[in-house]
Amino acid sequence: GYGAGVYNAAAVTSAGARAWNEPAEESDIIFLGAMWTLDNWGEDMLALRRGEKINYFETDASVVPVRASVVDTCPLGNYVLVSPNDRHTILYGSQEFGTSAGAPINPMTVRWADQNDFREWTPSAANTSGEVLLTEGSSLIGAIRSRNAINLWTDQAMYTQTFVGPPFIFNFTQVGSNCGLIGTHACVDVDGVSYWMGDNNFYMYDGRVRTMDCTVRRYLFNDFNMTQKEKVYAGINSEFKEVIWLYPMAGSDEPNGYVIYNYEENTWVYGKLFEEGIVTVFQDRNTFNNTITIGRVSATDSMYVYNNEPNGIYTGNNKNLP
């Protein structure tokens, strides 16, 4: 049909050309995935599905488990984060103030609610809500809390966001160019040092942006499915002083490869997780005693949450996990 690949063109001049009533085998149209971001609001939780409104889960709302409720007064957004200390709820990529309810999201707008109130998004002299439109890049990709600041990335640049109080509330400083983030969850922070994956390199920020000397860079990016790059997931394994990135290798639509950087020894390793399995999330040991991953070990398996190496035993389904 229309809209997918070359239509009504001679096959001898256009590869993949189709005539009337010849369906396309595949589409060249790429849609963004349904990416979720979560953050704590005290003991409660804020959750955002990209392109929608914030959902609020109140843990003490009832003795019976309840569903999260939509924050109706919130604009549509792409990524949510709660600013430390000053407690502002921030959207990265948001509808701009003054636009209609059905207005599109401006992917370069940072917008925040009133202090301690994630329901009040209308700026006034009586509150601290506001917004800023950043300029370097075409879309805000992700953000993480770091030491005394929030570090945020577009597809082209890195900024720092610091709380300065009224009247501006936040100060935004561009600290790097040509160092954009490859995907929303492709960044981590370790003791005030941020590490992230770009479209063709790895970077760190310790007061200034540095390109990391990755010894496996060529092998990794030559075997990478860039159409699924937003699924890259970065995690920390603090016990072994490692940062791990899960990424989709060529031919896979889900993360099935990994690259690990040891920030204490300055070494790199990479490899394939499973022959047919995937791992989509890696969480450091904090709430639980071991690292937590989500994935499956074969194409026919269901997705599971893995408690890796429980009690120091390396057996069972955990044997194939990195």
Regions found by a protein language model. Name each.
Residues 1-2, 24-30, 34-37, 138, ...:
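Beta-sheet repeat architectures centered on beta-propellers
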Residues 1-26, 115-136, 215-228:
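Surface-exposed loop and turn segments in beta-propeller and other repeat-based domains
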Residues 18-26, 65-72, 127-134, 170-176, ...:
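A short beta-strand motif characteristic of beta-propeller blades
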Residues 61-68, 119-127, 166-171, 211-213, ...:
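Beta-strand initiation motifs
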Residues 150-176:
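Surface-exposed extracellular loop regions of Gram-negative outer-membrane beta-barrel proteins
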Residues 53-58, 96-118, 155-163, 199-207, ...:
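Structural motif
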Residues 1-80:
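Surface-exposed assembly/interface segments
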Residues 48, 91-92, 153, 161, ...:
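Residue-level marker for isolated small/hydroxyl-bearing positions within beta-strands
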